[in-house]
Amino acid sequence: MAAEACVPAEFSKDEKNGSILSAFCSDIPDITSSTESPADSFLKVELELNLKLSNLVFQDPVQYVYNPLVYAWAPHENYVQTYCKSKKEVLFLGMNPGPFGMAQTGVPFGEVNHVRDWLQIEGPVSKPEVEHPKRRIRGFECPQSEVSGARFWSLFKSLCGQPETFFKHCFVHNHCPLIFMNHSGKNLTPTDLPKAQRDTLLEICDEALCQAVRVLGVKLVIGVGRFSEQRARKALMAEGIDVTVKGIMHPSPRNPQANKGWEGIVRGQLLELGVLSLLTG
């Protein structure tokens, strides 16, 4: 069975290949305009990315594909409009959403409690067109806590106190917005995809990343985990974009090192990168 990058269930199959998303996309100003806000320009990049991703079809082992930039667009747009009102010096870059984080809330590393209670972001969340019975989308009613997201935002809450302090200079984004699962509901990362499908997907996401970096005026991309760091470096170098790319340890509990004091390790990494002063000032 092939899995498609889905649009919301309320969109008909005839509309799936772009008419609805094209109309939605046209509501956001041209990213080349000098008059719109960084948030509007950033959202335009993401809507154009959605349009390209909606045409992809994935083969085994992928059986289910979720795109929270479609069914959780409302809280995602709220996140961008709230915290992307100005250009950003630093972009923290994740790989792709987790099933109990951004998949539920539309916010990168979006563990429900931190998104709702610290970031103060909420919004209606619908459903993917096809849901795995073990990976239901419950939005802000999701009872599971994503460990990676909880660790990530807890660190910056501790460092910054208020989200406005963090977002004064920084923003958080994922390289790929799609979530992949096999027949059992096991999470698959982009690296688990067959090479041809993976290469096509990542090239599309690379292009969108380069556009986002330009739109935000980013000077430093910090990959959260090795994949994000390496992918960002490759994409930006290929486009001749002169931006520094560094990395920090991923907070995933599947990373044994992250279970041995991730917060302390990453505080040290941020200090070495010269970013800590941006987060505490």
From Swiss-Prot:
Keyword Nucleus: yes
Signal peptide: none
UniProt binding sites for substrate: 95, 109, 174, 250
Gene Ontology CC terms, in alphabetical order: nucleus
Predominant subcellular localization, coarse grouping: nucleus
Biological role stated in the UniProt entry: Recognizes base lesions in the genome and initiates base excision DNA repair. Acts as a monofunctional DNA glycosylase specific for uracil (U) residues in DNA with a preference for single-stranded DNA substrates. Does not exhibit any enzymatic activity towards G/T mismatches.
Name assigned to this protein: Single-strand selective monofunctional uracil DNA glycosylase
Recorded name of the encoding gene: smug1
